[in-house]
């Protein structure tokens, strides 16, 4: 797995793609993790819309395919820092991979 300190994807394009709950495309894991925090689609989209470039943490390659890049952001919320990870997708413009509390590692 490779990491880099520059975003692979345009944050504003990501936010535009997820501008409403109807547009939210996420993995089951991301949806379940968000639900454990009490977040539904409306709340997830609300948090995603607050993301800023300064929240960027790293870009990393997928564990399964080193050619697929994923951007990771640590996003402040009323529940603390959230770990948000997304990638480009063939069918939809982007796919939300993770939405959970950031571990204190």
Give the ranges of each region predicted by the language model:
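Ribonuclease/tRNase effector modules and their secretory precursors
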Residues: 1-105
């Amino acid at each position: 797995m490779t990491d880099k300190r520059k975003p692979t994807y345009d944050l504003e394009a990501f936010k535009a793609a997820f501008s409403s709950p109807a547009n939210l495309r996420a993995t089951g894991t991301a949806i379940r993790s968000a639900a454990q925090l009490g977040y539904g689609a409306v709340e997830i989209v609300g948090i995603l819309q607050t993301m800023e470039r300064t929240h960027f943490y790293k870009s990393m390659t997928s564990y399964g395919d080193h050619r697929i890049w994923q951007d990771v952001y640590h996003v402040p919320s009323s529940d603390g820092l959230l770990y948000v990870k997304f990638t480009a997708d063939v069918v939809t413009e982007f796919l939300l991979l993770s939405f959970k509390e950031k571990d204190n590692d």
